[in-house]
């Protein structure tokens, strides 16, 4: 009997690379795992609790924007997943990415979600916290390790009392900027043994993104908005097997393999 995963698409119908890359990763586990795709924002599609694994994607726009019909059932699902894991032996395994990570942080009250002073676009180092150095999904990664980051919003001002009450831990922080006075954003949180989220995009496939970003029209648009030096650095980092490739190979595959192992043990 195959395990079941729900892929929650928060891209609101916009063209993106995140969902195809997540589907490609999930397809690798087709011998033990089947998955369904849910168009959360554009289609108001929300999975029920019959799934074993829930992968929440990134997406565009303001994570604090209200009024969408999908939002109440979306936050209701997060609450139900948390309560399920408190009450049941057979756990639900959850991964939040970027936009959904920001929404989860807002839902749990673990930090302040705000507009970033400047859009983050490209590849950057992030630094592990003490707990991040103990995080199994980051075991194969150096400190700092490199991530793909594309966002206009951030999570800062962590609520340490709330984190402690939940048993949650901040795993890594934005790169150090000694010449700037901005607070470093939270880049990953382990909410519980079964629930984790990252501000960055661990699904970023470096080979696929290289092809995508090197198309002339796209290259010209990026250089115009973000500058040639940032574009060149991103291309170098995507091509370097010790940078984005290591994160891509480690984080989501590690999450899925751990979830499959734990769920398979529960089924015995």
Model-identified regions with their sequence ranges:
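Short, solvent-exposed loop/turn segments that connect beta-strands within catalytic domains
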Residues: 1, 87-91, 179-182
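N-terminal beta1-alpha1 cap of cysteine-dependent amidohydrolase-like domains
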Residues: 1-85, 206-210, 216, 221-268
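Residues that mark the start of a beta-strand
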Residues: 2-4, 93, 146
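Short hydrophobic segments within beta-strands
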Residues: 6-10, 97, 150
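Short loop/helix-cap segments at secondary-structure boundaries that form the rim of catalytic
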Residues: 45-50, 105, 160-164
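Active-site metal-binding loops of divalent metal-dependent hydrolases
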Residues: 59-60, 101, 152, 202
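Cysteine-nucleophile active-site neighborhood
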Residues: 61-132
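Pocket-forming structural segment of enzyme catalytic cores
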Residues: 108-207
């Amino acid at each position: 009997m195959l395990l079941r995963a729900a892929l929650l698409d928060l891209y609101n119908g916009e063209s993106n690379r995140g969902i195809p890359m997540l589907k490609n990763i999930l397809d690798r586990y087709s011998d033990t795992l089947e998955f369904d795709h849910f168009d959360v924002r554009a289609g108001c599609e929300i999975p029920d609790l019959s799934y074993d694994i829930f992968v929440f994607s990134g997406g565009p726009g303001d994570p604090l924007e209200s009024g969408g019909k999908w939002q109440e059932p979306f936050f209701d699902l997060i609450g139900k997943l948390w309560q399920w894991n408190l009450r049941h032996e057979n756990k639900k395994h959850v991964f939040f990415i970027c936009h959904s990570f920001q929404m989860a942080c807002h839902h749990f009250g673990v930090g302040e979600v705000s507009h970033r002073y400047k859009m983050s676009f490209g590849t950057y180092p992030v630094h592990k916290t003490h707990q991040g150095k103990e995080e199994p999904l980051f075991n194969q990664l150096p400190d700092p390790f490199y991530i793909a980051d594309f966002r206009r919003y951030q999570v800062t001002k962590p609520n340490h009392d709330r984190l402690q009450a939940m048993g949650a831990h901040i795993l890594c922080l934005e790169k150090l900027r000694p010449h700037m006075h901005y607070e470093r954003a939270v880049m990953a949180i382990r909410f519980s043994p079964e629930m984790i989220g990252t501000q960055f995009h661990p699904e970023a496939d470096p080979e696929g993104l290289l092809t995508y970003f090197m198309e002339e029209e796209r290259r010209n648009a990026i250089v115009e908005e973000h500058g040639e030096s940032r574009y060149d650095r991103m291309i170098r980092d995507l091509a370097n097997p010790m940078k984005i490739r290591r994160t891509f190979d480690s984080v989501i595959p590690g999450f899925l393999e751990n979830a499959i192992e734990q769920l398979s043990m529960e089924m015995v």
